[in-house]
């Protein structure tokens, strides 16, 4: 049986018990997976209004706009939501590296045989 949450046109994010939703960011031009973060209602609304990715920092317990210190903002081109409305997909144009380490993507290491292997920058 179809329901509005899965099939309807009403935006109704399924916030978790902490009031958060997972956001996956990819490069709008290349499709590269850049990072995963979390949004609360306020950061989601700010992201939609400003077209710049803004999140809830679970460690610092505050709103943060990606790149507010480094200048490496993420310009939102498109926001999608999954069928359960519990995960967001932001297609962005990155204004610099996505990772705080300076890597283009936060996913710059492979897990092999229980160890981490750094992927060369030209292979990320």
Curated annotation (Swiss-Prot):
Pathway field: Amino-acid biosynthesis; L-histidine biosynthesis; L-histidine from 5-phospho-alpha-D-ribose 1-diphosphate: step 3/9
EC number: 3.5.4.19
Cofactor: how and how many bound: Binds 1 Mg(2+) ion per subunit.
Binding residue positions for Mg(2+): 82, 84, 86
Hydrolase in keyword set: yes
Cofactor: Mg(2+); Zn(2+)
Intrachain disulfide bonds: none
Gene Ontology process terms (BP): L-histidine biosynthetic process
GO molecular function terms noted in the UniProt entry: magnesium ion binding; phosphoribosyl-AMP cyclohydrolase activity; zinc ion binding
Keywords for the protein's UniProt record, in alphabetical order: Amino-acid biosynthesis, Cytoplasm, Histidine biosynthesis, Hydrolase, Magnesium, Metal-binding, Zinc
UniProt: Zn(2+) binding residues: 83, 99, 106
Keyword Transmembrane helix (UniProt): no
HAMAP family: HisI (MF_01021)
Chain's role: Catalyzes the hydrolysis of the adenine ring of phosphoribosyl-AMP.
PANTHER family (alphabetical): HISTIDINE BIOSYNTHESIS BIFUNCTIONAL PROTEIN (PTHR42945), HISTIDINE BIOSYNTHESIS BIFUNCTIONAL PROTEIN HIS7 (PTHR42945:SF1)
NCBIfam families with a match to the protein in the record: PRK00051.1
Subunit description: Homodimer.
Protein name, per record: Phosphoribosyl-AMP cyclohydrolase
Species assigned in the record: Zymomonas mobilis subsp. mobilis (strain ATCC 31821 / ZM4 / CP4)
């Amino acid at each position: 049986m179809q329901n509005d949450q899965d099939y309807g046109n009403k935006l109704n994010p399924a916030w978790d018990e902490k009031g958060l939703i997972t956001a996956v960011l990819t490069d709008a031009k290349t499709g590269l997976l850049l990072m995963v973060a979390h949004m609360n209602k306020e950061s989601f609304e700010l992201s939609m209004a400003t077209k710049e990715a803004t999140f809830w920092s679970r460690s610092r317990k505050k709103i943060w706009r990606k790149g507010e210190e480094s200048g490496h903002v993420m310009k939102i081109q498109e926001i999608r939501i999954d069928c359960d409305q519990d995960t967001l997909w932001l297609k962005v144009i990155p204004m610099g590296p996505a990772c705080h380490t300076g890597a283009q993507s936060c996913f710059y290491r492979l897990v092999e045989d229980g160890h981490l292997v750094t992927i060369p920058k030209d292979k990320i």
